[in-house]
Amino acid sequence: MTEYKPTVRLATRDDVPRAVRTLAAAFADYPATRHTVDPDRHIERVTELQELFLTRVGLDIGKVWVADDGAAVAVWTTPESVEAGAVFAEIGPRMAELSGSRLAAQQQMEGLLAPHRPKEPAWFLATVGVSPDHQGKGLGSAVVLPGVEAAERAGVPAFLETSAPRNLPFYERLGFTVTADVEVPEGPRTWCMTRKPGA
């Protein structure tokens, strides 16, 4: 039997509708999302949040890869994403509205995680998801690897945060190690993970 090889490429604006559906489905029940996004119209809110990350962060100032035409999506910021602060300042009010009744929890979680983020230039995996009906085919690693490889070529770390314990071995196989284990009061335990160059 031949091994399945996903088709991975940089995303375009044409990929947005399917990529947003993929990310929304992947994050609908994700622990951090459940903790920080209002349960009222939850999937609609998650969908819009993921669209903001995909379009305003990934496509506008970062890098986005899709596998199999959007069945898997990875959104990265890079050391060249110098406009990130301005973009987050612009979309921040809408993100706060989407958090709704969970805004205080979102702000608390952000405050707990921020000190563990790299101060030096790094590739930051802002969001990644695989469509539930395409999981287990290697699309996750296929869509994350281009960013990992770009960080390696640049000689800078790659960084991510996850609140799903099942994700830890997946990222460890890609060379990431846990650099912080953050207990969020009344929320999900969250791990910061870094992949140093040469890992």
UniProtKB/Swiss-Prot annotation:
GO molecular function (one): acyltransferase activity, transferring groups other than amino-acyl groups
Highest rank taxon of the organism: Bacteria
UniProt xrefs under InterPro entries: Acyl_CoA_acyltransferase, GNAT_dom, Trichothecene_AcTrans
Gene3D superfamilies per the UniProt record, alphabetical: 3.40.630.30
Coiled coil: none
Transferase as UniProt keyword: yes
Keywords of this entry: Acyltransferase, Antibiotic resistance, Transferase
The enzyme's E.C. designation: 2.3.-.-
Job of this protein: Detoxification of puromycin.
Biological processes annotated in GO: response to antibiotic
CDD domains documented for this protein: NAT_SF (cd04301)
Residue span, N-acetyltransferase domain: 6-198
Listed name of the protein: Puromycin N-acetyltransferase
Broadest EC class assigned to this enzyme: transferase
Keyword Acyltransferase attached: yes
Lineage: Bacteria, Bacillati, Actinomycetota, Actinomycetes, Kitasatosporales
